[in-house]
A protein has these predicted regions:
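PRPP-associated nucleotide enzymes
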Residues: 1-248
Length: 248
């Protein structure tokens, strides 16, 4: 929800997640708390597509993948449903001095999501946050140009929208995508990911209609990569190659 928080009153701030029941999350109990359960992102996407396809009224869904790692996953889900894949371009806002971690996210329409609890712990100044946000917005714009070539997102009004990524760590990147999709009036929003921490899956599930996650893990230390036997970070060239293969 939009809240007033000093200098950041126009941003969407989410408090720390509190673990609750796992309602609204469809998982594979055989994969619960296990590691290295998928060969790679394509394998994970194929398995996920089989499960997503069992949901009611998913025919004709809009499938949106979050680059980079979500593209091969979303590609397989779209193939299972006979849908066309589109992109939900969202980037985490990197913590100064620690580019592997983030304290929020920026989506394609300029929406900004701040992890307020982490921001307070880090003790970041307003100037630090503004600099990081502007850098992230620039990166999002560059990716829009590189990956979409000006193609508009499909109409989502009255349709089921499936948001796909290769996993949920904090969940804030996905939450930013959800916030940008919701005003487009989809009939429902489904988040489909191969793996997630239990807390992030619960956080996201409270804000969408359904979370489909094959591999939910409850350990305090969580890494998306630990679900995959073959893991590496996709670069922009590989994303373009995936999209070219699909003639997007």
């Amino acid at each position: 929800m939009p809240v007033s928080h000093g200098h950041f009153r126009n941003y969407y701030v989410v408090p720390d997640a509190e673990f609750r029941s796992m309602s609204g999350i469809l998982e594979n109990p055989l994969l619960h708390n296990r590691k290295y359960v998928f060969s790679d992102r394509h394998d994970a996407g194929k398995q996920l597509g089989v499960l997503v396809k069992t949901l009611p009224s998913v025919h004709g869904s809009v499938v949106l993948a979050i680059p980079a790692g979500g593209v091969p996953v979303g590609r397989e889900i779209a193939a299972a449903l006979g849908s066309r894949l589109s992109l939900a371009i969202v980037r985490k806002i990197q913590i100064p001095g620690n580019p592997e971690a983030g304290f929020g996210a920026v989506s394609w329409d300029g929406q900004v999501l701040i992890n307020e609890g982490l921001r307070a712990v880090l003790g970041l100044s307003d100037a630090d946050i503004e600099t990081a946000i502007e850098r992230t917005k620039k990166n999002v714009h560059e990716r829009i140009v590189r990956f979409t070539h000006g193609r508009a997102l499909p109409k989502m009004s009255g349709k089921s929208v499936i948001l796909a990524d290769d996993g949920l760590a904090s969940g804030f990147t996905m939450m930013a995508a959800v916030k940008s999709v919701r005003p487009l009036s989809p009939s429902r929003i489904i988040v489909a990911v191969p793996t997630a921490s239990a807390t992030s899956a619960e956080l996201v599930s409270r804000n969408v209609d359904q979370v489909v996650c094959l591999n939910v893990r409850t350990s305090r230390q969580f890494a998306v990569a630990d679900a995959y036997r073959q893991w590496y970070d996709l670069d922009d060239r590989e994303v373009v190659h995936e999209l070219t293969d699909m003639e997007l």
